[in-house]
């Protein structure tokens, strides 16, 4: 007896069994789910996989997204505790990790996250040996280094979300001051994603007009307009949002989808993301910092040699030393 489906459909060829543009998000907390919905809204993948250790939360998030399938352009949404669900991913976004506890040092937090990553990263690589890993968990620069070490992948396929969001915050605040949309305000935050980030004032421009040429004191303590405050706001903004709502998630989710769009569509756009900078700007240790990088379908293909002032190079080197001092004491890498 033929089923309803058999009566409805005449098969012509076998449907595809392997995804061609699969994305996995590891960790379904606030950040992971913001990344997931941002990627789905942009229609960047033909399959989305979610992984976490919390099975009920995982199933609930998967079902909730699946129920929105009519409004999305993604064929398949899957989830599981077992990393087999991540097989054949093009990009794996890692948002998992432990939160900093009150009174806990940064090094202790990093060591706890290293222990989490020691479980996650080998599983990711086992099921998707050709994937690109995008690390989002904080402290992102150090955990990108940890991922690179644990994965055995070439450095162009291990990328940290880095200063992509810091630069977006900077451009938003710049736009607020000038009454111009952030996409027309150009400026770069480089170095560590965090307190020691570097604002490249010499490159800040609108329509190719250098703002530092109009205001030579821009970014310095002598600036009567206080533009230095804009960079301080960038550094402080995450702390402020966390204080107000407990975490940040929407902006980082959008930032990650922006990076994924460049990778999945091979756009060769330039983003400030965290990459291995040994040998650049006089940095001698294996640290990951944000520099302007060209991204495409094979990962991070090149770094733009930005002309930095001596003071900016010195700040980058300080960032590198700060990170190395934490990294060199990490165990079991």
From Swiss-Prot:
CDD domains for the chain: LDH_1
Pfam families (UniProt xref): Ldh_1_C (PF02866), Ldh_1_N (PF00056)
Chain sites annotated for binding substrate: 106, 138, 169, 248
One GO CC term, this protein: cytoplasm
Swiss-Prot/TrEMBL keywords: Cytoplasm, NAD, Oxidoreductase
PROSITE patterns reported for this sequence: L_LDH
Listed InterPro entries: L-lactate/malate_DH (IPR001557), L-lactate_DH (IPR011304), L-lactate_DH_AS (IPR018177), Lactate/malate_DH_C (IPR022383), Lactate/malate_DH_N (IPR001236), Lactate_DH/Glyco_Ohase_4_C (IPR015955), NAD(P)-bd_dom_sf (IPR036291)
UniProt cross-references to SUPFAM superfamilies, sorted A to Z: LDH C-terminal domain-like (SSF56327), NAD(P)-binding Rossmann-fold domains (SSF51735)
Catalyzed reactions: (S)-lactate + NAD(+) = pyruvate + NADH + H(+)
Molecular function GO labels: L-lactate dehydrogenase activity
A biological-process GO annotation: lactate metabolic process
General function of this protein: Interconverts simultaneously and stereospecifically pyruvate and lactate with concomitant interconversion of NADH and NAD(+).
Summary of subunit composition and partner proteins: Homotetramer.
Homology family: Belongs to the LDH/MDH superfamily. LDH family.
NCBIfam families: L-LDH-NAD, PRK00066.1
Official protein name in the record: L-lactate dehydrogenase B chain
Taxonomic source organism: Sceloporus woodi
């Amino acid at each position: 007896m033929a089923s309803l489906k058999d009566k409805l459909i005449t098969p012509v060829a076998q449907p595809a069994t392997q995804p061609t543009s699969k994305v996995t998000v590891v960790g379904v907390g606030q950040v992971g789910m913001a990344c997931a919905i941002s990627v789905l809204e942009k229609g960047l993948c033909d399959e989305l996989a979610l992984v976490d250790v919390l099975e009920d939360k995982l199933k609930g998030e998967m079902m909730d997204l699946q129920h929105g399938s009519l409004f999305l352009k993604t064929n398949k949404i899957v989830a599981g505790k077992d990393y087999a669900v991540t097989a054949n991913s093009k990009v794996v976004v890692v948002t998992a990790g432990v939160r900093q506890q009150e009174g806990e040092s940064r090094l202790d937090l990093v060591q706890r996250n290293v222990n989490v990553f020691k479980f996650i990263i080998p599983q990711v690589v086992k099921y998707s040996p050709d994937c690109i890993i995008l690390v989002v968990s904080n402290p992102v620069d150090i955990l990108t280094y940890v991922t690179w070490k644990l994965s055995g992948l070439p450095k162009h396929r291990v990328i940290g979300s880095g200063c992509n969001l810091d630069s977006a915050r900077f451009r938003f605040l710049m736009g607020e001051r000038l009454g111009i949309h952030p996409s027309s305000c150009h400026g770069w935050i480089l170095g560590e994603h965090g307190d020691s980030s570097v604002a490249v004032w010499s490159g800040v421009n609108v329509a190719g007009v250098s703002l530092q040429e109009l205001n030579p004191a821009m970014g310095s303590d002598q600036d009567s307009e206080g533009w230095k405050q804009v960079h301080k706001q960038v550094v402080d903004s995450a702390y402020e949002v966390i204080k107000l709502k407990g975490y940040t998630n929407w902006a980082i989710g959008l930032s990650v989808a922006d990076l994924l769009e460049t990778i999945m569509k091979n756009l060769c756009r330039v983003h400030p993301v965290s990459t291995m900078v040994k040998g650049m700007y006089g940095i001698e240790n294996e640290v990951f910092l944000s520099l302007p990088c060209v991204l495409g379908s094979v990962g991070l293909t090149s770094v733009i040699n930005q002309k930095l002032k001596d003071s900016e190079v010195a700040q980058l080197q300080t960032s590198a030393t700060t990170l190395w001092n934490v990294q060199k004491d990490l165990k079991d890498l």
